[in-house]
């Protein structure tokens, strides 16, 4: 265990500890919880409430669900066009968090036709969280999301449109996967819930963080292809599974292994002993292209690692984590030595945000408590909210269902694999999204069949819970005009709720717009207060720093600041103080001509 005593009493650590505890949610959470409670009480008193209405709309939906291809397309198009329709009220997101800017750096790099960028001359002023500066200037994350966002930038002028399209494909793939495991009507319902609870509002679609849409798409393809392959062994299902495995490898390979390992075991058993398996020659012919795709993807990832990090066997994350972090990713790993931080904001992020949690997990009570809390927020709350919690009361019945036995047996492996990680955020579970939906919908089927004293209370409750999800989505569209928007980090817990973030990042975007409208090239030197929240980072740049209209740099000591200003002597130099009550641009203060600029750090 590593001591954090010098930092444990900082204001930042105090706020981080408060924000990570279970606390009352904002108005949207309270409204949904209230409606869920009312619905439960109503069905106990009037178990047939709304039956005439629901009985009229369910048959045509069931007929649609039986047309499986059309259902999948409808789910994907609904996710796409509904999100576009609400753009006037729910705008294209601005980058806000450290992860956002890191993924956008990858997208910009790929859009420039490069796999990495050379280390800039003044790199110590540009150091930031979740990026590497040496051996190259690059995002620390796996390249999959960056490649997709680069396509969005090149094709549509904005990387978010690629996120939107990928999110729509994710919702469609979830519906397609569910069709292989559940009756068609329930698969369509699952796809609709994916649109309402993930595709429209969650941070998966409305930030640039995580690439969840890509790993969830990959997981859905793998889990959806498995039963189809074992039934028909068609070439297309093998290719879809291979595409899913590649997507997992380019986004979240650790979780991808947790998902793919039991799939490989079951598939291998079928290949050896399955009664309906095709002849070996046919299998080899049909497996050649999928296997070649996977091998090519692994080779390309090795080449990318070589270009970006200097070694084909050095995976993304490794350089940045070894350079800046103390806490490792898994409980069995020892803590890293204390780095020599050049910037106090980065020191506080890696110590107050990460190391305290690492130390807590190294006691038995701490491990149990933190693990339960992580899964409560990242799995239960994110995927169920409050409206979808009641079906989980009958979740134990799912454990005995033959239909989903494979997914039930996978669940302990997935949970154990995630529990040994130091951190757990909902997008870490993205590869398992389709599986989680299948298990949750099966619990909902059991609730629908619940008939206390012969009355259809369960049927009515399921209908009302789905109605609540639809109503809450409508309310979320108008959340900003109604002043129901979720609070910003670190006060809010919007990352763990379906309603997602509000309109964050406006201050930095406003300052950057001002700078871009000025004639000539600009250099913005950022001075933080001692109590700055490191997650609200402003110092991020494009792939080509020296060629950018606006450069963001950290203020350091006076001599380093002077070197920076002299290097960019053709640029107008500005001071930006993000923590001041009124954020505005001001000329960077110089002591006198030819002297070192004054530094807030030396006052």
Regions found by a protein language model. Give the residues of each.
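Hydrophobic, aromatic-rich transmembrane alpha-helices
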Residues: 42-44, 171, 266-267, 273, ...
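Signature aromatic-anchored transmembrane alpha helix within multi-pass, membrane-resident enzymes
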Residues: 71-73, 260, 264, 288-295, ...
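Hydrophobic/aromatic-rich transmembrane helices and adjacent perimembrane loops
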Residues: 103-104, 211-212, 251, 257-258, ...
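Membrane-interface transmembrane helices that cradle and orient dolichyl/undecaprenyl
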Residues: 148, 179-182, 214, 222-240, ...
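Membrane-interface alpha helices of multi-pass inner-membrane proteins
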Residues: 150-151, 177, 190-195, 225, ...
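Transmembrane-helix motifs of polytopic, lipid-linked glycan transferases
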Residues: 158-182, 220-222
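Transmembrane-helix signature of polytopic, membrane-embedded enzymes
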Residues: 174-198, 216-217, 230-240, 401-409
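Perimembrane helix-loop-helix junctions
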Residues: 225-228, 258-298, 302
